[in-house]
Amino acid sequence: MMEDGVIRTARIKLKSKTRQKKKIAAAVYEYQADCDGEWGEIYFDFEKGRQKILWLADWDTTKSRIYAKRVIDFVLKQDSEELPKERLIAFEK
């Protein structure tokens, strides 16, 4: 259970990306909750506007998926042609 007001972090790494007609059509990001434990993966289909959590990182709960949701929000706000290779995302619960 997370306490309110505590700063949390999600580390992300671009695992792969697929191009179609010189544009990034899809990407897979690995993410790690609070820089600890096993990595999870999230698939982004930019052409169809869909995302899918392939598997949750350690410390990300099945019910809230707070870390995965923050990663999805962050990636969707980026220019799909300039996706970050690695980033540390900090957020407050």
Language-model regions: role of each:
Residues 6, 38-41, 50:
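Intrinsically disordered, low-complexity regions
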Residues 14-44:
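Amphipathic, interaction-prone secondary-structure segments
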